[in-house]
Amino acid sequence: MVETLVTIRTARHGDEIKIADVHDAAWRDAYRGIIPGRELERMIARRGPAWWRNAIARGSRLLVLDFDDRIAGYASYGRNRVPALAYGGEIFELYLAPEFQGVGFGRRMFEAAQKDLADHGYRSFLIWALAENVRALGFYGRLGGRIVRRAPEKFGEETRERVAFGFD
């Protein structure tokens, strides 16, 4: 029998390359055909290892899911960036490498971020998703989120709708 260790922990120095790899793969999988190609490439390129190294060094709230010594996903979160919405916290990003999706790791990452937000006084929080990202909409809906706001988001010359899920 083979045992595989799955842990969720705070990102640390040395994780930046693996987080950047997950970001690249997850964004290509989630947004190809939704975000215009050139814009998608530009957005991915901005989030290379140096960006993640700086986020870790700044002490950003950033969790990673470590599966058998491989970073399979990450979540970043903190204070809500839209004060007009009455939610204290926000999960900014929650992504898994495509090969780790659909096995419960996303829920585990969500619950870990939710717990840390609550531990820091944020009992309610938001998560934004693009309206065309059907998998994300289903995922956040199954977790109990309800759509509380719709807003446009520009990607180059094109506009897409994004939706905010509220969790109380």
Label for each model-derived stretch:
Residues 118-128:
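Conserved GNAT acetyl-CoA-binding A-motif
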Residues 60, 160-164:
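Short hydrophobic/aromatic beta-strand or adjacent loop that forms the aromatic wall/cage
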